[in-house]
Amino acid sequence: MKRGGAQHEESIIGASLVAATLGLSVPAMALEVTPYGAIRVATWWTSSTYYNPAGDPLHDADFTLDLQGDSYVGMRVKEGDFSALAELGAYNPKNRSAGVELRMLFGEWNFGNGKLRVGYAPSPYVYRSEMIYDADGGFNGYASLFDGRYAQIKLSMNNGFYLALMRQENVGLAGIGATNSPTTNAGNGYINTPFNMTSTTYMAGYTDFDTFMPKTVLGYEGKAGIVTYGGGVAGNYYKIRTVAGNVQTGKDEIYSYLGFAHAKIDLAPFEIKVAGHTAQNLGNLMNNAAAAAGSFYSNNPATGKNAYTYGGWGQLGYTLNNKVKMFTGVAYESNEMRGRTSDDRMAAFANLQYAVTKNFNIVPEFAFLNEMRSAAGTKQERIYATGIKWEMKF
Protein backbone atom coordinates (compact mmCIF):
# COMPACT_ATOMS: atom_id res chain seq x y z
CA MET A 1 0.00 0.00 0.00
CA LYS A 2 2.86 2.38 0.77
CA ARG A 3 4.43 1.77 -2.60
CA GLY A 4 1.14 2.44 -4.43
CA GLY A 5 0.60 5.64 -2.43
CA ALA A 6 4.10 6.83 -3.37
CA GLN A 7 3.35 6.19 -7.03
CA HIS A 8 0.20 8.31 -6.78
CA GLU A 9 2.11 11.14 -5.13
CA GLU A 10 4.95 10.92 -7.69
CA SER A 11 2.44 11.10 -10.55
CA ILE A 12 0.76 14.18 -9.09
CA ILE A 13 4.14 15.86 -8.47
CA GLY A 14 5.20 14.96 -12.02
CA ALA A 15 2.06 16.49 -13.47
CA SER A 16 2.69 19.64 -11.41
CA LEU A 17 6.24 19.90 -12.81
CA VAL A 18 4.94 19.50 -16.36
CA ALA A 19 2.40 22.27 -15.77
CA ALA A 20 5.10 24.50 -14.26
CA THR A 21 7.46 23.84 -17.20
CA LEU A 22 4.75 24.75 -19.67
CA GLY A 23 4.01 27.87 -17.68
CA LEU A 24 7.66 28.97 -17.91
CA SER A 25 7.67 28.45 -21.66
CA VAL A 26 4.55 30.53 -22.35
CA PRO A 27 6.34 33.38 -24.20
CA ALA A 28 7.93 30.98 -26.71
CA MET A 29 4.67 29.11 -27.29
CA ALA A 30 2.44 32.20 -27.39
CA LEU A 31 -0.07 30.37 -25.21
CA GLU A 32 -1.95 31.33 -22.08
CA VAL A 33 -1.28 28.53 -19.58
CA THR A 34 -2.92 28.39 -16.15
CA PRO A 35 -2.01 25.55 -13.77
CA TYR A 36 -4.38 24.67 -10.92
CA GLY A 37 -4.99 21.93 -8.39
CA ALA A 38 -6.42 20.75 -5.08
CA ILE A 39 -4.94 18.33 -2.54
CA ARG A 40 -7.50 16.75 -0.22
CA VAL A 41 -7.15 14.50 2.82
CA ALA A 42 -10.16 13.19 4.74
CA THR A 43 -10.50 11.94 8.31
CA TRP A 44 -13.67 9.96 9.04
CA TRP A 45 -15.31 8.00 11.81
CA THR A 46 -17.75 5.63 10.12
CA SER A 47 -20.31 3.39 11.81
CA SER A 48 -22.49 0.87 9.99
CA THR A 49 -25.44 -1.38 10.67
CA TYR A 50 -25.79 -4.30 8.27
CA TYR A 51 -27.77 -7.54 8.24
CA ASN A 52 -27.34 -11.30 7.93
CA PRO A 53 -29.76 -13.39 5.80
CA ALA A 54 -32.12 -13.75 8.76
CA GLY A 55 -32.39 -9.97 9.02
CA ASP A 56 -30.48 -9.68 12.29
CA PRO A 57 -28.54 -6.41 12.67
CA LEU A 58 -24.74 -6.44 12.87
CA HIS A 59 -22.50 -3.46 13.63
CA ASP A 60 -19.03 -2.13 12.96
CA ALA A 61 -17.20 1.20 13.32
CA ASP A 62 -13.78 2.46 12.20
CA PHE A 63 -11.56 5.54 11.90
CA THR A 64 -9.84 6.35 8.60
CA LEU A 65 -7.36 8.98 7.39
CA ASP A 66 -6.54 8.93 3.69
CA LEU A 67 -5.89 10.93 0.56
CA GLN A 68 -9.10 11.65 -1.34
CA GLY A 69 -9.19 10.23 -4.84
CA ASP A 70 -10.46 13.53 -6.23
CA SER A 71 -7.21 15.31 -5.36
CA TYR A 72 -5.97 16.63 -8.69
CA VAL A 73 -3.61 18.84 -10.67
CA GLY A 74 -4.37 20.31 -14.06
CA MET A 75 -3.81 23.11 -16.49
CA ARG A 76 -5.81 25.25 -18.87
CA VAL A 77 -4.30 26.33 -22.19
CA LYS A 78 -5.69 29.01 -24.51
CA GLU A 79 -4.66 30.30 -27.92
CA GLY A 80 -7.07 32.60 -29.69
CA ASP A 81 -10.44 30.91 -30.18
CA PHE A 82 -9.08 27.53 -29.12
CA SER A 83 -8.54 26.22 -25.60
CA ALA A 84 -7.78 22.94 -23.88
CA LEU A 85 -7.86 21.44 -20.42
CA ALA A 86 -5.93 18.50 -18.95
CA GLU A 87 -6.49 17.18 -15.42
CA LEU A 88 -5.06 14.22 -13.49
CA GLY A 89 -6.54 12.87 -10.26
CA ALA A 90 -4.93 10.81 -7.49
CA TYR A 91 -7.15 7.79 -8.22
CA ASN A 92 -10.71 6.77 -9.01
CA PRO A 93 -12.47 6.50 -5.61
CA LYS A 94 -14.35 3.44 -6.95
CA ASN A 95 -11.26 1.76 -8.44
CA ARG A 96 -8.17 2.73 -6.48
CA SER A 97 -6.05 -0.17 -7.76
CA ALA A 98 -6.15 1.34 -11.27
CA GLY A 99 -3.80 4.10 -10.08
CA VAL A 100 -3.64 7.70 -11.23
CA GLU A 101 -6.80 8.72 -13.09
CA LEU A 102 -7.25 10.92 -16.13
CA ARG A 103 -10.08 13.18 -14.98
CA MET A 104 -10.44 15.44 -18.01
CA LEU A 105 -8.74 15.99 -21.35
CA PHE A 106 -10.50 18.05 -24.01
CA GLY A 107 -10.16 20.87 -26.50
CA GLU A 108 -12.74 23.56 -27.29
CA TRP A 109 -13.29 25.85 -30.23
CA ASN A 110 -15.20 29.07 -29.64
CA PHE A 111 -16.71 29.75 -33.06
CA GLY A 112 -18.72 32.81 -32.03
CA ASN A 113 -22.25 31.44 -31.72
CA GLY A 114 -21.16 28.66 -29.40
CA LYS A 115 -18.44 26.15 -28.53
CA LEU A 116 -17.46 22.75 -29.88
CA ARG A 117 -15.80 20.41 -27.37
CA VAL A 118 -13.91 17.26 -28.35
CA GLY A 119 -12.37 15.02 -25.71
CA TYR A 120 -12.96 13.41 -22.33
CA ALA A 121 -15.16 15.10 -19.71
CA PRO A 122 -18.09 14.54 -17.28
CA SER A 123 -21.57 13.82 -18.61
CA PRO A 124 -23.65 16.99 -19.19
CA TYR A 125 -26.37 15.89 -16.74
CA VAL A 126 -23.95 15.83 -13.77
CA TYR A 127 -25.19 18.20 -11.03
CA ARG A 128 -23.61 17.85 -7.60
CA SER A 129 -24.50 18.70 -4.03
CA GLU A 130 -21.97 19.93 -1.44
CA MET A 131 -21.84 16.55 0.33
CA ILE A 132 -18.17 15.59 0.92
CA TYR A 133 -18.52 11.98 2.16
CA ASP A 134 -17.12 9.41 -0.28
CA ALA A 135 -14.48 11.77 -1.75
CA ASP A 136 -16.84 14.70 -2.38
CA GLY A 137 -19.47 12.21 -3.47
CA GLY A 138 -22.20 14.83 -3.69
CA PHE A 139 -24.96 12.17 -3.42
CA ASN A 140 -23.14 10.00 -6.00
CA GLY A 141 -25.40 6.97 -6.50
CA TYR A 142 -28.13 8.54 -4.35
CA ALA A 143 -30.03 10.51 -7.01
CA SER A 144 -27.08 12.67 -8.07
CA LEU A 145 -26.62 11.24 -11.62
CA PHE A 146 -22.81 11.45 -11.48
CA ASP A 147 -21.48 8.62 -13.67
CA GLY A 148 -17.87 9.53 -14.35
CA ARG A 149 -16.30 10.90 -17.49
CA TYR A 150 -16.56 9.84 -21.12
CA ALA A 151 -15.17 10.51 -24.58
CA GLN A 152 -17.57 12.95 -26.21
CA ILE A 153 -18.30 15.51 -28.89
CA LYS A 154 -20.36 18.34 -27.43
CA LEU A 155 -21.87 21.33 -29.19
CA SER A 156 -22.98 24.16 -26.85
CA MET A 157 -24.80 27.15 -28.31
CA ASN A 158 -24.84 30.63 -26.80
CA ASN A 159 -28.64 30.44 -26.50
CA GLY A 160 -28.28 27.69 -23.86
CA PHE A 161 -29.01 24.56 -25.90
CA TYR A 162 -26.44 21.78 -26.20
CA LEU A 163 -26.06 18.39 -27.86
CA ALA A 164 -23.56 15.78 -26.68
CA LEU A 165 -22.61 12.54 -28.43
CA MET A 166 -20.83 10.25 -25.99
CA ARG A 167 -19.23 6.83 -25.82
CA GLN A 168 -22.11 4.37 -25.61
CA GLU A 169 -22.61 2.08 -22.63
CA ASN A 170 -22.78 -1.71 -22.92
CA VAL A 171 -23.69 -3.33 -19.62
CA GLY A 172 -24.12 -7.11 -19.65
CA LEU A 173 -27.22 -9.02 -18.58
CA ALA A 174 -25.83 -9.48 -15.06
CA GLY A 175 -26.34 -5.76 -14.42
CA ILE A 176 -23.87 -3.87 -12.26
CA GLY A 177 -21.57 -6.89 -12.13
CA ALA A 178 -21.13 -6.88 -15.92
CA THR A 179 -20.30 -3.29 -16.79
CA ASN A 180 -18.14 -2.39 -19.78
CA SER A 181 -18.69 -5.86 -21.22
CA PRO A 182 -17.06 -6.59 -24.60
CA THR A 183 -18.21 -9.03 -27.25
CA THR A 184 -16.60 -12.26 -26.05
CA ASN A 185 -15.39 -13.43 -29.47
CA ALA A 186 -13.70 -10.15 -30.43
CA GLY A 187 -10.28 -11.82 -30.43
CA ASN A 188 -7.25 -11.07 -28.28
CA GLY A 189 -6.01 -8.39 -30.65
CA TYR A 190 -9.17 -6.33 -30.19
CA ILE A 191 -10.57 -7.15 -26.75
CA ASN A 192 -9.11 -3.98 -25.16
CA THR A 193 -9.64 -1.62 -28.09
CA PRO A 194 -12.52 0.77 -28.86
CA PHE A 195 -13.66 -1.82 -31.42
CA ASN A 196 -14.25 -4.61 -28.90
CA MET A 197 -17.94 -4.85 -29.81
CA THR A 198 -17.17 -6.42 -33.19
CA SER A 199 -16.81 -10.21 -33.50
CA THR A 200 -13.54 -11.30 -35.13
CA THR A 201 -12.97 -14.88 -33.91
CA TYR A 202 -15.15 -17.98 -34.35
CA MET A 203 -16.58 -19.52 -31.18
CA ALA A 204 -19.42 -22.02 -30.83
CA GLY A 205 -20.67 -20.07 -27.83
CA TYR A 206 -20.34 -16.33 -27.26
CA THR A 207 -22.04 -13.09 -26.23
CA ASP A 208 -22.29 -10.42 -28.91
CA PHE A 209 -23.01 -6.75 -28.13
CA ASP A 210 -24.46 -4.89 -31.11
CA THR A 211 -24.14 -1.10 -30.82
CA PHE A 212 -25.66 1.36 -33.27
CA MET A 213 -25.34 4.90 -31.94
CA PRO A 214 -23.58 7.02 -29.33
CA LYS A 215 -25.17 7.83 -26.02
CA THR A 216 -26.94 11.08 -26.85
CA VAL A 217 -27.78 13.99 -24.54
CA LEU A 218 -29.87 17.00 -25.56
CA GLY A 219 -30.29 19.74 -22.98
CA TYR A 220 -30.57 23.39 -22.02
CA GLU A 221 -28.92 25.62 -19.42
CA GLY A 222 -30.29 29.07 -18.64
CA LYS A 223 -30.79 31.81 -16.08
CA ALA A 224 -33.80 33.93 -15.18
CA GLY A 225 -33.21 36.50 -12.45
CA ILE A 226 -32.13 34.72 -9.27
CA VAL A 227 -32.74 31.25 -10.75
CA THR A 228 -30.12 29.28 -12.66
CA TYR A 229 -31.66 26.17 -14.19
CA GLY A 230 -31.19 23.35 -16.66
CA GLY A 231 -32.55 20.07 -17.90
CA GLY A 232 -32.68 17.67 -20.78
CA VAL A 233 -33.02 14.12 -22.03
CA ALA A 234 -30.52 11.33 -22.70
CA GLY A 235 -30.79 8.00 -24.48
CA ASN A 236 -28.80 4.85 -25.22
CA TYR A 237 -29.62 1.66 -27.17
CA TYR A 238 -27.89 -1.65 -27.87
CA LYS A 239 -28.59 -5.37 -28.34
CA ILE A 240 -27.15 -8.44 -26.65
CA ARG A 241 -27.15 -11.80 -28.47
CA THR A 242 -26.14 -14.99 -26.68
CA VAL A 243 -25.10 -18.09 -28.62
CA ALA A 244 -24.44 -21.62 -27.30
CA GLY A 245 -23.48 -24.58 -29.49
CA ASN A 246 -23.87 -22.43 -32.61
CA VAL A 247 -27.52 -21.80 -31.67
CA GLN A 248 -28.82 -18.38 -30.62
CA THR A 249 -30.24 -18.78 -27.13
CA GLY A 250 -31.14 -15.20 -26.34
CA LYS A 251 -31.63 -11.75 -27.80
CA ASP A 252 -32.22 -8.66 -25.67
CA GLU A 253 -32.82 -5.13 -26.90
CA ILE A 254 -32.00 -2.60 -24.18
CA TYR A 255 -33.48 0.86 -24.46
CA SER A 256 -32.35 3.37 -21.84
CA TYR A 257 -33.57 6.91 -21.41
CA LEU A 258 -33.28 9.69 -18.85
CA GLY A 259 -35.16 12.92 -18.23
CA PHE A 260 -33.50 15.34 -15.81
CA ALA A 261 -33.88 18.86 -14.40
CA HIS A 262 -32.07 20.99 -11.84
CA ALA A 263 -32.06 24.52 -10.48
CA LYS A 264 -30.29 26.87 -8.08
CA ILE A 265 -32.11 29.77 -6.44
CA ASP A 266 -29.95 32.61 -5.08
CA LEU A 267 -31.66 34.16 -2.05
CA ALA A 268 -28.47 35.62 -0.56
CA PRO A 269 -27.36 34.87 2.06
CA PHE A 270 -29.41 31.68 1.46
CA GLU A 271 -29.33 29.45 -1.60
CA ILE A 272 -31.48 26.49 -2.64
CA LYS A 273 -30.44 23.73 -5.04
CA VAL A 274 -32.78 21.00 -6.30
CA ALA A 275 -32.50 18.22 -8.86
CA GLY A 276 -34.79 15.47 -10.10
CA HIS A 277 -34.89 12.74 -12.71
CA THR A 278 -36.88 9.84 -14.12
CA ALA A 279 -35.45 7.04 -16.23
CA GLN A 280 -35.76 3.60 -17.78
CA ASN A 281 -32.77 1.25 -17.28
CA LEU A 282 -30.75 4.06 -15.72
CA GLY A 283 -27.94 1.69 -14.73
CA ASN A 284 -27.45 0.67 -18.36
CA LEU A 285 -27.44 4.30 -19.49
CA MET A 286 -24.93 5.53 -16.93
CA ASN A 287 -22.87 2.43 -16.11
CA ASN A 288 -22.20 3.92 -12.67
CA ALA A 289 -20.22 1.84 -10.17
CA ALA A 290 -22.30 3.45 -7.41
CA ALA A 291 -25.67 2.74 -9.07
CA ALA A 292 -28.37 0.72 -7.36
CA ALA A 293 -28.47 -2.90 -8.53
CA GLY A 294 -32.20 -2.49 -9.19
CA SER A 295 -31.64 0.20 -11.84
CA PHE A 296 -30.44 -2.26 -14.53
CA TYR A 297 -32.32 -4.12 -17.26
CA SER A 298 -32.98 -7.78 -16.41
CA ASN A 299 -33.97 -10.73 -18.59
CA ASN A 300 -35.16 -12.75 -15.60
CA PRO A 301 -38.41 -14.43 -16.77
CA ALA A 302 -39.89 -14.14 -13.27
CA THR A 303 -39.98 -10.33 -13.43
CA GLY A 304 -40.36 -7.56 -15.93
CA LYS A 305 -37.38 -6.62 -18.07
CA ASN A 306 -37.14 -2.84 -17.78
CA ALA A 307 -36.21 -1.02 -14.57
CA TYR A 308 -37.87 2.32 -13.85
CA THR A 309 -36.16 4.94 -11.71
CA TYR A 310 -37.19 8.24 -10.19
CA GLY A 311 -35.33 10.33 -7.69
CA GLY A 312 -34.04 13.70 -6.64
CA TRP A 313 -32.32 15.75 -4.01
CA GLY A 314 -32.57 19.13 -2.34
CA GLN A 315 -30.01 21.30 -0.58
CA LEU A 316 -30.15 24.46 1.53
CA GLY A 317 -27.07 26.66 1.87
CA TYR A 318 -26.29 29.69 4.02
CA THR A 319 -23.33 32.06 3.72
CA LEU A 320 -22.48 33.50 7.12
CA ASN A 321 -19.53 35.59 5.92
CA ASN A 322 -16.60 35.35 3.51
CA LYS A 323 -15.10 32.53 5.61
CA VAL A 324 -18.05 30.37 6.65
CA LYS A 325 -20.70 28.59 4.58
CA MET A 326 -23.16 25.94 5.80
CA PHE A 327 -25.03 23.32 3.78
CA THR A 328 -27.55 20.57 4.45
CA GLY A 329 -29.33 18.28 2.03
CA VAL A 330 -31.32 15.10 1.53
CA ALA A 331 -31.66 12.70 -1.44
CA TYR A 332 -33.95 9.81 -2.35
CA GLU A 333 -34.09 7.38 -5.28
CA SER A 334 -36.41 4.48 -6.12
CA ASN A 335 -35.78 1.73 -8.69
CA GLU A 336 -38.79 -0.39 -9.62
CA MET A 337 -39.54 -3.41 -11.81
CA ARG A 338 -42.70 -5.46 -12.22
CA GLY A 339 -42.71 -8.56 -10.03
CA ARG A 340 -40.07 -7.58 -7.50
CA THR A 341 -39.46 -5.31 -4.49
CA SER A 342 -38.53 -1.69 -5.14
CA ASP A 343 -34.79 -1.04 -4.69
CA ASP A 344 -34.73 2.25 -2.78
CA ARG A 345 -32.01 4.31 -1.13
CA MET A 346 -31.64 7.68 0.56
CA ALA A 347 -28.92 9.93 1.99
CA ALA A 348 -28.58 13.13 4.02
CA PHE A 349 -25.77 15.39 5.19
CA ALA A 350 -24.91 18.63 6.98
CA ASN A 351 -21.56 20.39 6.80
CA LEU A 352 -19.74 23.65 7.48
CA GLN A 353 -17.16 24.98 5.04
CA TYR A 354 -14.52 27.14 6.73
CA ALA A 355 -11.91 29.05 4.71
CA VAL A 356 -8.89 29.23 7.01
CA THR A 357 -7.05 31.15 4.29
CA LYS A 358 -7.61 31.79 0.60
CA ASN A 359 -6.00 28.44 -0.25
CA PHE A 360 -6.81 26.28 2.78
CA ASN A 361 -10.29 24.98 3.69
CA ILE A 362 -11.56 22.58 6.31
CA VAL A 363 -15.04 21.03 6.06
CA PRO A 364 -16.52 19.10 9.01
CA GLU A 365 -19.57 17.00 8.06
CA PHE A 366 -22.12 14.52 9.34
CA ALA A 367 -23.52 12.11 6.73
CA PHE A 368 -26.15 9.37 6.72
CA LEU A 369 -26.61 6.74 3.98
CA ASN A 370 -29.49 4.26 4.01
CA GLU A 371 -29.61 1.49 1.41
CA MET A 372 -33.06 0.47 2.74
CA ARG A 373 -34.09 -2.78 0.95
CA SER A 374 -32.69 -4.52 -2.11
CA ALA A 375 -34.68 -5.65 -5.15
CA ALA A 376 -34.82 -9.07 -3.46
CA GLY A 377 -36.53 -7.53 -0.43
CA THR A 378 -33.61 -7.97 2.00
CA LYS A 379 -32.51 -5.30 4.45
CA GLN A 380 -29.37 -3.42 3.44
CA GLU A 381 -26.77 -1.37 5.25
CA ARG A 382 -27.09 1.95 7.02
CA ILE A 383 -24.02 4.14 7.42
CA TYR A 384 -23.41 7.00 9.84
CA ALA A 385 -20.26 9.05 9.26
CA THR A 386 -18.71 12.14 10.78
CA GLY A 387 -15.47 13.58 9.55
CA ILE A 388 -13.43 16.46 8.17
CA LYS A 389 -12.05 17.24 4.73
CA TRP A 390 -8.69 19.07 4.74
CA GLU A 391 -8.16 20.85 1.44
CA MET A 392 -5.36 22.98 0.01
CA LYS A 393 -5.89 24.40 -3.47
CA PHE A 394 -4.24 26.74 -5.91
Task: Annotate each language-model stretch with its function.
Residues 61-71, 99-103, 146-151, 210-216, ...:
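Residues that define the transmembrane beta-barrel architecture of outer-membrane proteins
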Residues 1-32, 188-190, 195:
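Cleavable N-terminal export/targeting peptides
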Residues 48-59, 170-208, 238-254, 282-307, ...:
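Solvent-exposed loop segments that connect transmembrane elements
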Residues 65-87, 219-235, 317-331, 364, ...:
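Surface-exposed extracellular loop regions of Gram-negative outer-membrane beta-barrel proteins
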Residues 354-356, 380-394:
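Outer-membrane beta-barrel "beta-signal"
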Residues 82-94, 116-118, 138, 163-167, ...:
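Transmembrane beta-strand segments that form the barrel wall of outer-membrane beta-barrel proteins
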Residues 222-347:
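Detector for outer-membrane/organellar transmembrane beta-barrel domains
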Residues 31-46, 59-179, 212-214, 218-225, ...:
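Outer membrane beta-barrel
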